[in-house]
Amino acid sequence: MYKRQLISILIQQNCYFSPLRTGTVDKVLIVCPLTLVVNWKREFRKWLGRNSIGVLAVEGDGRIEVEQFVNSRQYQVLILGYERLRSSVQRLSRAIPAIGLVICDEGHRLKSRDTKTTRCFDILQTRRRILLTGTPIQNDLREFYTMVDFVYPGLFDQYSVFKRVFEDPIMRSRAQHLSLIHI
């Protein structure tokens, strides 16, 4: 359901990715687990048909698809797995026009600022970012901070600010609650 709404928003907002309109996005990169690449492609076809926008899905090696996306205005959307992103990021950073929007499905995979995958997005330098996840907090609040910082860099200035304002009070309240239960 959310993917349908997202695709609808992309098309309405970007007027079929028209490069002549101010504030539109010419190229979109969708990064997801490899098992979801075909599903994303199917959803685009289901809701937009085959000819409304150019969609490429990387299911195998992907070199040809990445080159087509990077060097052609014919394709506006590239769907690829997280693993393929790491091997393609340098080529993707040279896309003409540049990638204007990145969508990360199962975005909780970006749980640390120091992972190779998370650092790939720094190379792309895309300002517009959407992160989709059903589990934003898996282990600790630092992972949540990383995801928020990915979508809105600098919102909390630094992790130390986030920790002082949010994480520490939450952890203290949890500790107090636990001690009351165990008395």
Regions found by a protein language model. Give the residues of each.
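ASCE P-loop NTPase motor core, strongest for the SF2 helicase catalytic module
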Residues: 3-174, 181
